[in-house]
Design a protein with these regions (language model features):
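A short glycine-rich, Lys/Arg-flanked "PGG" loop and its adjoining helix->strand segment in the class I
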Residues: 192-205
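A short acidic, Gly/Pro-enriched loop at the edge of an enzyme's catalytic core
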Residues: 168-176
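C-terminal lobe and adjacent flexible extensions of AdoMet/dcAdoMet transferase-like proteins
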Residues: 272-328
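Conserved SAM-binding strand-loop segment of SAM-dependent methyltransferases
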Residues: 149-164
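Conserved class I S-adenosyl-L-methionine
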Residues: 101-111
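SAM-dependent methyltransferase
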Residues: 210-281
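Conserved SAM-binding loop of SAM-dependent methyltransferases across substrates and taxa
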Residues: 112-125
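Conserved SAM-binding loop
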Residues: 141-142
Length: 328
């Protein structure tokens, strides 16, 4: 859709340039701009035609396309998750807040249990519980992630197919993670507040809840964002947003060099909660202190550094991701 729209726009720009040339006489710079526009349109058309041809050729020969051969969970882990940096932030922040090391972690909405596995890999005294209501994705995690752990390490990971609002663990945990915005599946204050109260019950006396959140004025728009990765493209789509209810529908798509696509590999039907709402709900649930950790920026470039610190004022950027840290 966006390629087609871009091609139309370029054609219109090329038309304006040519119209000016015909009316006012040839101008070298305008001629170059016109030709560049035509060349870009031609390249876009050629790439689209070649991709369609590749897909059709694969199907004609009975071969599977790259999209058909790909595993959506592998693509997700490569494009969305960075468990190493997440581990570093959680362990470092907990130690700074509580003056001790966290050992027992619960990963809510754990999916393929990537963070559970990262947690037990780091220290021999670390244990983890992953909770997800989807049994299929838990099975995938057992087969592809837990199986790769060193002998004995997998015994320190428990995966539970349960509702995060009802789950209990044998003993209180040091840390609960609710990452990748999954808690936004709860669309009412009653539902989300109930989840937060359940988390509070499951934490040790000095336990901490870690969450991420996203926002910015572009998060309310119906847009697509593309990111090129090794061997595929990741596409994040805001398919619809309702400003009255706050409900947002998002999709993750993947596209491949042969022109094939994995459309709607993942779909998220959420409420886009704001930071003030989340802080209020966490406080109402009984957490003693709630802080927003905002990404720091480089003074020279203005770009994010990947480091997060407590903040009470944030930049009104088009898009941002931050962490919420709630202490029991």
């Amino acid at each position: 859709m966006y390629v087609a729209a871009g091609a139309v726009c370029l054609r219109f720009m090329a038309y304006l340039c040519m119209h000016y040339i015909l009316c006012a006489g040839p101008d070298p710079e305008l001629t170059r701009n016109y030709q560049a526009g035509v060349d870009k349109v031609t390249i876009i058309q050629q790439e689209a035609a070649m991709n369609q041809k590749n897909v059709k050729e694969c199907r004609r020969k009975g071969k599977q396309t790259m999209a058909e051969l790909a595993d959506r969970h592998v693509l997700y882990e490569k494009s969305v998750q960075c468990v190493a940096s997440e581990y570093k932030f959680v362990s470092k922040t907990f130690r700074k807040l509580r003056k001790r090391k966290a050992r027992y972690l619960r990963e809510d909405f754990c999916g393929t249990a990537g963070m559970c596995c990262e947690w037990v890999k780091r220290k021999p005294d670390h244990t983890a519980v992953g909770v997800d209501i989807d049994g299929d994705v838990l099975d995938w995690g057992r087969e592809h992630n837990l199986s790769r752990l060193k002998p004995g390490a997998h015994l320190r990971v428990s995966l539970l197919q349960e509702d995060v609002c009802k789950v209990t663990t044998p003993k209180p945990v040091d840390v609960v993670l609710a990452m990748n915005f999954s808690y936004q599946i709860f669309k009412t204050r009653e539902q989300l507040g109930g989840y937060f109260r359940q988390v509070l019950k499951g934490l040790a006396d000095d336990g901490v809840l870690f969450m991420d959140a996203f926002g910015g004025y572009e998060s309310f728009k119906e847009i697509k964002e593309k990111r090129k990765l090794k061997g595929f493209k990741y596409i994040w789509e805001h398919a619809s947003y309702n400003p009255i209810s706050g409900e947002i529908l998002c999709h993750i798509h993947f596209s491949f060099p042969d022109g094939s696509k994995m459309k709607r590999a993942f779909t998220y039907d959420w409420r886009l909660w704001t930071l003030p709402e989340l802080q209020e709900l966490l406080t109402e649930a009984g957490f003693s202190r709630v802080q927003v950790y905002w990404e720091q920026t480089d003074d020279e470039t203005g770009e994010g550094t990947g480091k997060y610190k407590p903040a009470t004022v944030g930049e009104a950027d088009p898009g941002w991701v931050c962490f919420l840290v709630a202490e029991k």
